[in-house]
Amino acid sequence: CPACLPSPGPLLSVWATAQQDSRIQRRGRYLPASTAHPAKMLPAIAATAITHYTQPGELVLDPMCGIGTTLVEAIHLGRDAVGVEFEERWAHLAAAGIAHARRQGATGSAEVFCGDARQLPAVLPAHLARRVALVITSPPYGPSVHGQVRAEQRSGQGGGVRKYDNRYSRDPANLAHHGLDDMLAGFTRILTGCRALLRPGGIVAVTARPWRQHGELVDLPAAVLAAETRAGLIPAACHVALLAGLRGDHRVARPSFFQLDNIRKARRRVSPGT
């Protein structure tokens, strides 16, 4: 988000991370059960960051690893990886995903620890201190952008929408259940713990996007930048992950369900009966 960067600002660039849509990126590479996670990172985003900032054999950490997207992409690229996941269900699935990647020929090694990333020194082995080349992670987004949706037809009525796979467990300690201020305070603690694990010159890469809550914009990228600064990190770059495909000089849109639904409704208002 260039607007939230201090002047003159770090390096800005655009990454083409949606040359394939998300389903194709995950098909076969990830276990079918992984689709149930409410907030999965796009594999190409993780792979691009890992390729950009690390070399084969180096160590990558994701302190909020979910189903292990960062870990899977890292070991496919010949890096080693460590992940921390708060919920046992997803930690087990991340470990299974690592085993699946190894069966597919991934050459790196990875390990998942189940625990609270706000307490990284208590969760991870001490020998990892100052060994991590890259931290890549993402804080929980608003519930409005979690999960998947399905259109449903009702007899004698217009179609409806059902949302599913959009919730974590009910454990109140999960940051996903906290308000924005509490979530960012917890995320700052996580970043502070990550800083102690970085090798000299190591990088922390955080993916974030804004969303709307009750009609108001929540500028998560700017809030994340502030959290990084509080954790003692120095902004180095801002990479925009393009969520559309590129074909020469043409852009291939990859709209969400709700974007398409909004377009359909707008067209009906302009041309009733179409």
What residue spans do the PLM features occupy?
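Class I S-adenosyl-L-methionine-dependent methyltransferase catalytic core
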Residues: C1-T274
